[in-house]
Amino acid sequence: MAKYSKEALDEALLQAQSSDISMKTKGIKFLRQASCLETGTKNTYPIRDWFSETKNYTKLFKIVKSEKDPKLLWEYLFLIKTYCERYIDLAYLVKDSQNFIAKKENTEFKIKACELGELFLVNQDASVRQAAASLLWYLKKTSEVWSVIIELMQKKRDYITLSHIGIMIRNCYSLLNDDKVITDSFENTVTKENLISLKDAEALKEAVSFSLEKTPKAAKKAGFNSVSETLDGIITTLTKTAER
């Protein structure tokens, strides 16, 4: 049996529902690995076919909603974001994908992913809030995530958290300085004014400086010196826009 066959993915989803933490972790790890694989290989087709089956993603999202362990929730939110990015939104790079791209289940998957992001954006655990914010930013390019990011950076500044925040900030800068029409993952137009406010950009700049001061090792490893410069660019762009 191929490693990422339908049967193997079914088994992983079953393991993810186990009351045994080691078995549950094993199942989630397998699903995450599947979502992170390089696309365009022989594994791509069975993986995306499995994830795009209504019964499978419905069960997956139900499991995520009932999960209480912050570490496992982070894994779930990360794998969902990665699947959306690699398998759905970049499907046009994979040959013989016309039928897959046309599947309404892909949009339904992303709608349910947004619902999860909104649900866990107010979770008590900072790492879960970060994962939810990253997911929502990827799918919707919504400014609502920044207040959450600013708040959690006061308390959680490990390398993984900061590196994901850095990715969001750099992406925001790229979008602000792109002449193309900005769209979210649903092809809805997003105005530059709705990406981030000047107030939030300035607060992020302070939070980044605070991270470099309080946890320099993790912050520097996450590239926060360049992230700080990126925020300077965002603030400059927003200031010029406000002066027009």
Regions found by a protein language model. Name each.
Residues 3-13, 40-62, 89-95, 107-118, ...:
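Amphipathic alpha-helical scaffolding segments comprising HEAT/armadillo-like alpha-solenoid repeats
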Residues 19-20, 68-69, 124-125, 157-158, ...:
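Short inter-helical turns and helix N-cap capping residues of alpha-solenoid HEAT/ARM repeat scaffolds
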Residues 24, 73, 129, 161-162, ...:
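Residue-level detector of extended alpha-helical repeat arrays and alpha-solenoid scaffolds
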Residues 25-37, 71-82, 131-134:
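Non-membrane alpha-helical segments in proteins
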Residues 27, 76, 132, 164-165, ...:
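Conserved hydrophobic register position within alpha-solenoid helical repeats
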Residues 34-38, 83-90, 138-142, 168-179, ...:
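Residue-level signature of the C-terminal ends
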Residues 204, 208-244:
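Eukaryotic acidic, Ser/Thr-rich intrinsically disordered low-complexity regions
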